[in-house]
Amino acid sequence: MNYKTVDVILERALLGDDISPQEGVVLLTQTDSGAIASIRATADKLRQQQAGDTVTYVINRNINFTNICEQHCSFCAFRRDDGDADAYWLDWAGIREKSHDAVQRGATEICMQGGLHPQAQIDGKSLPYYLKLVETIKQEYPQIHLHAFSPQEVQFIARVDGLEYVDVISALQNAGVNSLPGTAAEVLDDEVRRILCPEKINTATWLEIIGTAHKVGLHTTSTILSGHIETPEQKIGHLEKLRSLQQTAINHKYPARITEFIVLPFVGQEAPKSLRRRVGRDQPILADALLLGAVARIYLGNWIPNHQPSWVKLGLAGATEALTWGCNDIGGTLMEEHITTMAGAVGGTCMEVATLQNAIASIGRPYQQRDTLYHKVDAAKKLANTVMSNG
């Protein structure tokens, strides 16, 4: 593909136009270093226009409440069967302890997800168990933002209890869930999903659950798991579905929408052998993740202005570099993260705030703490949170 075509696409993007799926594929398949440099520069300029120069971060904690799961996704090294030596399931005291620790350390957000544990029920029902998870945290820490339960978990609860998705989402929201993680998306293409995660929800169900959350006023994030068996066309198809979903939320004036987009590069080190062989490497290729991040900024930025790399997947140096390829946020402190780390990632499981701040400062950009919904967290709010947690 010649420079002229790439330049024309990038010029249109800089004028504020949405690029087409075909144009997205053109950008994503560039191998010429000059063309890639132009894509990076355009993404960086759009990031500046759409999200500003300040790089944000969030103080949060991950709670993966169980690794027992009925599914067998081909990329997952986290799941265990009930009875495995290293299977675990946190009790209520464990949930409270981790929540207390998070708040003491200044967290404004708890991100909670877990395996699909068939025994995670109260009186033979799934939803009451999940509601108790929420209430266990919210009764003690009503001020914490609870970012919890993927579309896959929503579908699991609905299936087990014979409920509609909207009823599950509304019940979780009423109990205190503040936003839904847009995980379990992997690649929104059923051909890929049949190989990667055949037991998981299909593309239409993922889109339906996220769209339903927006309708009832629950914000969500969005993600892509990239760098395994998917094609450039399938990656762009994924971005197109997300853009369309966000356009629907905005055009229909739904009370909530997608707050951010995160590229999650595939980590294969501990993945099952069949997928490792097929992918042919254990760690993400940084250049591929950076290019996808840049194209995602160009493709989605008019509609989803906040873009985040994964320091867990890429390491902090890789994530910092992504801030010059279209990203405006460096994510959270996490405090612990089991799923990616068990897959063999090199990024680690916890970041101190100062470490994130120093990484941002190293590229000459200002930094700012934010909350889950990208509001600035100021000193007064931090103080109020600490007082409430010590009260």
UniProtKB/Swiss-Prot annotation:
One of its GO terms (molecular function) is 5-amino-6-(D-ribitylamino)uracil--L-tyrosine 4-hydroxyphenyl transferase activity. Pathway: Cofactor biosynthesis; coenzyme F0 biosynthesis. It holds the Pfam family CofH_C. Residues 55-302 form the Radical SAM core domain. Its cofactor is [4Fe-4S] cluster. The keyword Manganese does not apply. It is an enzyme of class 2 (transferase). Transmembrane segments: none annotated. [4Fe-4S] cluster binds at residues 69, 73, 76. It catalyses: 5-amino-6-(D-ribitylamino)uracil + L-tyrosine + S-adenosyl-L-methionine = 5-amino-5-(4-hydroxybenzyl)-6-(D-ribitylimino)-5,6-dihydrouracil + 2-iminoacetate + 5'-deoxyadenosine + L-methionine + H(+). InterPro entries: Aldolase_TIM, CofH/MnqC-like_C, CofH_family, F420, FO_synthase_su2, rSAM. PROSITE patterns: RADICAL_SAM. Binds 1 [4Fe-4S] cluster. The cluster is coordinated with 3 cysteines and an exchangeable S-adenosyl-L-methionine. HAMAP family: FO_synth_sub2 (MF_01612). Belongs to the radical SAM superfamily. CofH family. This is 5-amino-6-(D-ribitylamino)uracil--L-tyrosine 4-hydroxyphenyl transferase. The lineage of its organism: Bacteria, Bacillati, Cyanobacteriota, Cyanophyceae, Nostocales.
